[in-house]
A protein has these predicted regions:
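Residues that define the transmembrane beta-barrel architecture of outer-membrane proteins
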Residues: 6-10, 27, 43-49, 87-93, ...
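Hydrophobic alpha-helical segments and helix pairs
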Residues: 10-54
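Outer-membrane beta-barrel domain signature
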Residues: 1-5, 38-42, 77-86, 120-126, ...
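Transmembrane beta-strands of outer-membrane beta-barrel proteins
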Residues: 12, 27-32, 49, 63-69, ...
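Transmembrane beta-strands of outer-membrane beta-barrel pores
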Residues: 1, 18, 33-39, 55-57, ...
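Detector for outer-membrane/organellar transmembrane beta-barrel domains
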Residues: 46-124
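Outer-membrane beta-barrel "beta-signal"
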Residues: 135, 139-141, 168-182
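Short loop/turn motifs that connect adjacent beta-strands in outer-membrane beta-barrel proteins
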Residues: 2-4, 19-28, 41-43, 57-64, ...
């Protein structure tokens, strides 16, 4: 729940990629920063730093496997820091598999993630960790550099006692995402 003021999340990202040689495997390393921005309530904003390894062509020519790790020392921004009386750090581990569907602009993906916070801040029965998952279908509109995704996403967080608004952020739901690449 982003409160009454923030109804949109925009997350710009900046990073650097470089090829890496691991014996006969040639993944790409990606390191960078993501800025979580909640339009209308900047007190929720925070930075997250990440590292990914992108392994392409594992099962066939166009698939990819992307394990990643992310860290923030200020999860939830100023709002969380003030409500907890201190900054909350969070580690996030994820593995994503993506593959095209035939020789089209459609694709499929699946991911499994694990979050671990420095305090018990997640779910209705305050926990310091949880798992999340996603299964999605994508469409790449290459002339404009757009990627549309429709995914089912969920977590193992408990929702008993949460408001309907707060449940939306953690229970299984359909999520549409539109990404623009430059």
């Amino acid at each position: 729940d982003f409160g009454d003021e923030a109804h949109l999340e925009l997350d710009p990202q900046i990073g650097y990629t470089a090829p890496v040689t691991l014996g006969s495997i040639h993944p790409t390393a990606d390191i960078g920063m993501l800025r979580y921005n909640y339009v209308g309530n900047s007190d929720l904003n925070y930075n997250e730093y990440y590292f990914k390894m992108i392994f392409n062509a594992l099962l066939h020519q166009s698939d990819s496997l992307i394990p990643s790790i992310s860290y923030t020392n200020n999860y939830g921004g100023k709002v969380t820091s003030e409500s907890m009386g201190k900054d909350i750090s969070n580690w996030y581990f994820n593995v994503l598999y993506a593959t095209p569907i035939s020789q089209s602009d459609f694709g499929a993906n699946a991911s499994l993630g694990y979050s671990k916070a420095s305090e018990e801040i997640y779910g209705s029965e305050a926990e310091d960790h949880f798992f999340d998952w996603k299964i999605g279908v994508t469409y790449a509109y290459k002339p404009m550099g757009l990627l549309a995704e429709l995914a089912a996403m969920g977590s193992n967080l408990t929702t008993g006692g949460l408001s309907d608004t707060n449940k939306k952020g953690v229970k299984t739901a359909a999520v549409f995402t539109l990404t623009k690449s430059f």
